[in-house]
Each structure stands twice: as structure tokens, then as C-alpha cells.
Amino acid sequence: MRSISGKELCRHLERQGWVLNRSKGSHFMYEKEGFPLLVVPVHGSKPLRIGTLKGLLRDAGLTEADLDAA
């Protein structure tokens, strides 16, 4: 699995219908009906750790293939 930055993940989530609810510092909170609040850490262009990315994808109902297709 390739790692991506928090910024890139945010852009992908927004294309999938997630809406930015609020942000506090470097953490962006996204919401989508039927899913729990998703907190994405955004630290510039620094890549997310693989475990963090996998957990966020799982919570968002997405797969690694969804990222590759974008």
C-alpha cells in the first residue's frame, strides 16, 4: 500500500461525498450520513502512517483500491 498525505486523503474523501464539519489545529473532522465522524490528521505534505491510513479507510468504508482508482 502506498502512503499518502492527510491533504491528499481529504481531497479524496471530499470527492466521495464527505463534508468538512470542522477543524481544530491540524485535525480535520469529516462527516457523512451513516458513518461515524472521521478525524484526519493533516501535517502538511507529511505522509500518513500505514496503520493510520488503513484505519481511516476502514472507518470511511473505502478500500485501498478506491485510492488507486482516484
Give residue spans per PLM region.
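C-terminal structural segments of small proteins and small subunits
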Residues: 44-70
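Long, low-complexity, intrinsically disordered polar/charged segments
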Residues: 1-11, 35-36, 59-61, 65-68
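N-terminal first-folded block
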Residues: 1-24, 29
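A short, structured beta-strand/loop element
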Residues: 20-51
